[in-house]
A protein has these predicted regions:
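Zinc-dependent deaminase
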Residues: 1-20, 71, 87-150
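Small-residue (primarily alanine) positions within well-ordered alpha-helices
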Residues: 13, 17-20, 30, 56, ...
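Short, flexible loop/turn motifs enriched in small residues
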Residues: 23-27
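A short, polar/charged loop-to-alpha-helix boundary motif
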Residues: 45-59
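Mobile, glycine- and charge-enriched loop segments
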Residues: 57, 61-79
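Short, thiol/selenol-centered motifs that function as redox-active sites or metal-ligating centers
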Residues: 75-89
Length: 150
């Protein structure tokens, strides 16, 4: 069960995802927070910037800049993180990740859990609907984003 703060910050990650979708990109948004306060927020900008590493989580972390520590932060993401973003979560010692949905893409949740990260999966209907719409409307872009051929 998500706390009120978790729900609020996940909604902001969803809004970032929605904005990315409206820009013609992949609808994945993220928020990095400490003590319920936003440090930074971002969205997948692979298409917009032509940068294969510009995932939503990476965009938020870049915008956060250097932090003394990430061990007291929470990462909110509209979609389950890929292996690159999961590795970054572990590398920086982020202790909690709140995931909007892991139906469209998953598999790395267990990896970050095995590394001591608390993971909450919301199965948020808005996140699920947005990803479903994106995958239906732009299947080739989705396959490119997850590095699959078909």
């Amino acid at each position: 069960m998500l706390s009120e703060i978790d729900q609020k910050l996940l909604k902001i990650a969803y809004e970032e995802a929605k904005e990315g979708f409206e820009e013609g990109g992949c609808p994945i948004g993220s928020v990095l927070a400490r003590d319920g306060k936003i440090i930074a927020q971002g969205r997948n900008q692979r298409v917009q910037k032509g940068d294969p590493i510009a995932h939503g989580e990476m965009d938020a972390l870049r915008k956060a800049g250097r932090q003394k520590t990430y061990r007291d932060t929470v990462l909110y993401t509209s979609l389950s993180p890929c292996m690159m973003c999961s590795g970054t979560i572990v590398q920086f010692g982020i202790t909690k990740v709140v995931i909007g949905e892991n139906k469209s893409f998953g598999g790395n949740d267990e990896f970050i859990i095995s590394r001591g990260v608390e993971v909450l999966i919301a199965n948020d209907k808005n996140c699920i609907q947005l990803m479903s719409q994106f995958i239906k409307e732009k299947p080739e872009l989705w396959l490119e984003d997850i590095a699959e051929d078909e």
